[in-house]
Every structure is written in structure tokens, then in C-alpha cells.
């Protein structure tokens, strides 16, 4: 595993423990795990990159943590990890996504266009409404969309 990947995994593991209340504690813990060149500014950048926040743990201590419901999608996030649910009725498809991912995914769906059966999309923060064209059977469009999400890595 690449050194940056190991550092990222160790960093996430520390924050999941909900014990680090300061950046200096994170630096010390990472150094104890063998990351000797880590410093406070690097930890600060990592906290921003991973969307970490300070919040109270079960002992009412202020600690850094990575809330999964607030995770920020990136361009390297597989689509199948960002799509939570797909549902539809006779006239509309609704795709539920991770928070912040709907507009990215709607843009991709819009690029498929009318030839693939998509008349248009409306995206919020975590939901997309998809309107199919008249000429495309709903089941065919659902299958195409599901295949797109499952094949994207």
C-alpha cells in the first residue's frame, strides 16, 4: 500500500476512535504509528480534506471525527458508492444519493441525453428527479441507469 494511503487509513482510524481533541494529539498519535514526518499543518489539511469536524463524543469531550453522513463526494468516488436508492413510478425516476452528490450524478445523466431516454433531470443536494422521454419504456431506462451506476469504478 502506498505511504499516503497508509497515512489516510491511519488518520481515519484515529478519528473513528473519537479520542483526539486537538491537532497536536493527532500528530502525536500518527507519529507513534510510524509517520515520523507528520506535522500540525499536514494534519490541518487532512482534517479539511476529509471533512472532519469537532463535536462531543459520548463522554461529552470535544473531539475530531469523520461523520459518514457528511462525507464529501470526490471525482474519484465510485458512482455506486454515491447512489443510495433508485425508485420510480409511471412518469418519474427518483435517485437518492449521498449528500452533495446529486448534482454531479445529474450532470452525468444529462450527458446521456434523449438518445438514451432521459428528457431531463432536476437535482438537489441528495436527490435527483429524472424525466424519461415518451419513447423509452421505464423499465429499459431503469436498467440503463442501474447498469451505469454499477459499472462505474
Swiss-Prot record:
GO terms for cellular component: cytoplasm. It is found in: Cytoplasm. One of its GO terms (biological process) is regulation of arginine biosynthetic process. The keyword Amino-acid biosynthesis applies. One of its GO terms (molecular function) is arginine binding. Its main location: cytoplasm. Regulates arginine biosynthesis genes. It comes from Haemophilus ducreyi (strain 35000HP / ATCC 700724). This is Arginine repressor. SUPFAM superfamilies: C-terminal domain of arginine repressor, Winged helix' DNA-binding domain. Keywords: Amino-acid biosynthesis, Arginine biosynthesis, Cytoplasm, DNA-binding, Repressor, Transcription, Transcription regulation. It comes from the Bacteria. Pfam families: Arg_repressor (PF01316), Arg_repressor_C (PF02863). Belongs to the ArgR family. Pathway: Amino-acid biosynthesis; L-arginine biosynthesis [regulation].
Amino acid at each position: 500500500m502506498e505511504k499516503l494511503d497508509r497515512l489516510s487509513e491511519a488518520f481515519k482510524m484515529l478519528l473513528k476512535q473519537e479520542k483526539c481533541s486537538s491537532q497536536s494529539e493527532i500528530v502525536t498519535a500518527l507519529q507513534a504509528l510510524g509517520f515520523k514526518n507528520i506535522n500540525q499543518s499536514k494534519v490541518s489539511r487532512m482534517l479539511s480534506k476529509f471533512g472532519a469536524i469537532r463535536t462531543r463524543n459520548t463522554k461529552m469531550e470535544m473531539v475530531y471525527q469523520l461523520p459518514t453522513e457528511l462525507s464529501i463526494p470526490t471525482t474519484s468516488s465510485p458512482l455506486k458508492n454515491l447512489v443510495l436508492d433508485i425508485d420510480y413510478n409511471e412518469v418519474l425516476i427518483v435517485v437518492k444519493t449521498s449528500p452533495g452528490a446529486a448534482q454531479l450524478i445529474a450532470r452525468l445523466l444529462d450527458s446521456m441525453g434523449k438518445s438514451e431516454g432521459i428528457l431531463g433531470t432536476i437535482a438537489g443536494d441528495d436527490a435527483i428527479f429524472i424525466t424519461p422521454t415518451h419513447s423509452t419504456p421505464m423499465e429499459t431506462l431503469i436498467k440503463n441507469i442501474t447498469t451505469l451506476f454499477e459499472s462505474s469504478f
